[in-house]
Amino acid sequence: MIKSYYLFFIILIFLIFINNFILCENNNNNKYNNNNNYPFINVDKIIYTNSSNSIYLVWSNEQFNLILQSSYNEEFDDIVMIGEYFDKIETTGWGELNITFNSNSATIQISDNEQAYFTGFIESVLTGERINQMYNNFAASEFTNSDHTPSPKLIDFLNTQMEFVRDQVFENNGSSQYWYSTGLIMSQFDGLVNGYQQSPFPQLSEIQLYILTSAGDLETLVTLFPSSSSSSSSTTNENKNKNIKISSIKPNFKDELTDCSGFIRILPDYSDVYFGHTTWRYYYALLRIYKFINLQFNFQDTPMEYKVSFSSSPGFISSKDDFYITGNKLAIMETTNNIYNESLYQYTIPQSVLVWQRAMIANMIATNSSDWVKIFSEFNSGTYQNQWMVFDYKLFIPNKQQSSSSLPPNTFWIAEQIPGQVKTADLTNILNEQGYWKSYNIPYFESIYNISGYSEKTDLPPSYQYSYEKCPRSLIFSRNASDVLNFEDMKSLMQFNNYKTDPLSYSSPLNSISSRGDLLTIENGNRSAVAFGGVDSKITSFNQVLTLSCTAISGPSTNGGTLPPFTWSQSPLFQNITHIGVPETFNFDWQEMGPYPN
């Protein structure tokens, strides 16, 4: 009897061990996103046949169904999410995407992760064809080997980074708002993947879609891990953290001027503050979607409303431009800086959070400017080095002569990132003193400027190109700032390119607020034309921020009609550039984005 008891006890212990082992394995699978953890969504296939759609995600017949609004049956369908996509890229240069959670859903409880997952799923179903076009354009230009695929080392870096993020979410999302929010961003990405893979369009893998949505970070990573050895020189440095070979890339066209122009203007009568951004990029990426997301989360029983509008592109969960307006009345943008000191890349490690993720996490959590830059600074990936600008419109009262007619402290913060460091500061006093803030791809902080290697570049011709105070855009912004007295003036400034007669442009279409690399000639730029330059402008103001709205234009600048519109057929140089789905000619007008419910 005793022996039988011991035998029973041993068998019981063994069964408990096996059960715990299985649970452990299941948990490990869960943290890496076993897709079975998300609800199945039945998609009405007719959605894929229309370029513009209004759809509902409904709970009916004991399952989630994605249907056209016209198919909605009030008696049987409980609306969970609303999605709208209007593809006007051929007529205005923009698609418009609006995804909203219905908090009044009556028959089923929706978790935060499901909300986020549904958001990504709906986006990829509505924009799947554009996502496929965007990825093919991106891969054809960014991956220079014969089959246009990323290098194995790049894939390894991103897989390791994604694993790190999912690990941290799994271990900390119950106690940390940061990792809870990160988990929601990753659930949105999972929805994007699953929604796209359920579509009839040519398949893209999870890592391909992760590469696409990480396009900003890849500006650094494709340099560190080139897909073709022909793009790198013979010198390399060792990354001490992961034994990564860093290619010493000779500065190419884009390295010289990087991305974007930003400008903030306080009107002299204190009636408004304009917040404007002009994106610079290669023209193959001129597939633009303005997005609005309206979700309602809870962290530890505390409401965490997530409302954000932003300029973006197909397959991007973030902006990448970057330009955001949040429900907390924050306006956020960035311009990109270079790294000329390659030793800094030892701090570019996969055990980190990518820039696109950190920006969206900060958008989700931050209620003021100082919080935004603080949250963004955590888990620095050392990729996509930017100057971030955050303006808190809650602290601006139009026409009210506040003490000394100035913005209060903490209204305007900036953050400048390099590998291994993010420097932040409240620069409201500078904005008050100047009446404006200018940003143009050169670090503001002297310490960041020096350690990045800019100071050594000033000895190279043209020396002005690397000077914070003397580069063309700095001088143009300072000269033209006082001319901005109304919204039309601001629109003109953000599209400004008068290179033919402006002495500050040195006769080059690159040297202005919205550059036109396609207008380069041997005479004016000592190089051939290239399909790169300013591709849009977005401007918001006090009243627009209240409804997460802005005014935007898509396409290379015509400077109010004095420059020819860009067209792909204007040069044989552009004919071999893959630009699927991109309009042939860009001659669009300004568009109103919003208002969106706030």
Swiss-Prot record:
Q: Name one GO cellular component term.
A: extracellular region
The Gene Ontology biological process annotation of the record reads: phosphatidylethanolamine catabolic process; phosphatidylinositol catabolic process; phospholipid catabolic process
* InterPro entries per UniProt: PLipase_B-like
Kindly give the Gene3D superfamilies that the UniProt entry links to this protein. Answer: 3.60.60.30
Q: What is its EC number?
A: 3.1.1.-
Alphabetically list the UniProt keywords.
Answer: Glycoprotein, Hydrolase, Lipid degradation, Lipid metabolism, Secreted, Signal
Localization terms from the record: Secreted
Task: Please tell me where this protein is predominantly located.
Answer: secreted
Q: According to the UniProt entry, where is the signal peptide?
A: 1-24
Citing just one GO molecular function, the answer is: phospholipase activity
**Top-level EC class as recorded in UniProt:** hydrolase
Q: Which residues are glycosylated?
A: 50, 98, 173, 341, 368, 450, 480, 526, 576
Family per similarity comment: Belongs to the phospholipase B-like family.
Its biological function?
Probable phospholipase.
What is the official name of this protein in its record? Phospholipase B-like protein G
Its lineage opens with:
Eukaryota, Amoebozoa, Evosea, Eumycetozoa, Dictyostelia
Its gene? Answer: plbG
